[in-house]
Amino acid sequence: MIMKKTLSFLLFIFCVFSLQAETIKTKVKSDAMNKDIPCVIITPTNYNPSATYPVIYLLHGYGGNQNTWPNIKKDLSQTATQDSIIFVCPNGENSWYWDSPFNKESQFETFISKELVSYVDKNFSTRDDRTGRAITGLSMGGHGALWLAIRHQDIFGAAGSTSGGVDIRPFPDNWDMKKQLGEYINNKEIWDNHTVINQINKLQD
């Protein structure tokens, strides 16, 4: 009797875990930065290579990494399965998701919008056009999502932002931005060109 209960319990545990979405921890090669970027990719438990899935790119905030979103949103796996979505969580370091004109190892606009999207579309069964891609993020990641979505409307069909700043210029000494853009006092034009609010005119109807 005890053996039957034990086997039944183990079978139950196996079934529960087999219904969880798959969480894939990988590294994606960036030719632009000549390094590998850690990423977490979450696929539905009923992932079918014959089907195609929309992809949501989740960008973390300052001080975060590829594990930030899976840690703060414990139900990402459940959502991936329920809504048949693939979630992609890259490590954006403290890059603000720009291509830094000063730091060749911080070219995250190119990485996210080109290299990572290409990797995901090549290795997973995705809806590989803008209608199948969305991007969103928190704080620095919210800024990055807007920055990338506005500048790459051919890649991302939808965007969201939670607490993402749209004008970085009032904060020249904060959050390592000057490591990416240089000192504000000497590089005002660069700062002007890298703030989201000055990209609005690029939005298409």
Where are these regions (language model features)?
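N-terminal secretory signal peptides that target proteins for export/translocation
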Residues: M1-M3
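Sec-dependent N-terminal signal peptides
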Residues: T6-F17
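Non-catalytic cap/lid and distal C-terminal segments of serine-dependent acyl enzymes
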Residues: A21-D205
